[in-house]
Amino acid sequence: GHYDKYVERGIPVDEKFALSISELTMEDWILTFKLDITHPIAILIERTIAKLKKQGNYNITDIISSLEKDEKSDNQTKNAATGLFEAADTWGVFEREGQDPTKIKDLINAGTTTVLDLSVYNSVGAFNVRALVISLVSRKIFNQRMDERKKEEIAAISKGLDYFSEQEQKENPLVWIFIDEAHEFLPKEGKTIATDALVQVLREGRQ
């Protein structure tokens, strides 16, 4: 969403960045929109996302269309929910129609430092977009590394080798994640959308 603006201003950039909206969970949206789980808007969003996930990949346009067609909620609730997703569409963080979302393998290369500039995304005010991005990227990096670790252990066992002494180059190596102002996403009280993902990385990420 901000790539073209950077190019126009002569700011060095390498690749576009875009998240797949279908990877967000119901809890992600509740935390992002700061809703109570029992609020009518949250209930409508939960029902809508659950239905769309059964269909596979979807985008914001699909979400808005499904919200508008909901027969269980009143117009005021549907308009409010639709407005939230129309706002999300302006964040410049989700893939557009015809655009492929960023893959984790594009961000991770052994011996290479990848900088993901989140300064263009809002972290204060109504929506914490930076926390949303950090949550999804951290979660995907962690899950990919866990899957790779299982493959490495199975391969080591099949070779009759000690997994921990094996020094082969890993296809998906261990990743160091450095987050500027990380305390903003791990508050002493309460939580952000990034809190659970970061806590999991802190507890289990050494693998």
Regions found by a protein language model. Give the residues of each.
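P-loop NTPase motor domains
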Residues: G1-R203
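Anion (oxyanion) recognition and catalysis
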Residues: R206
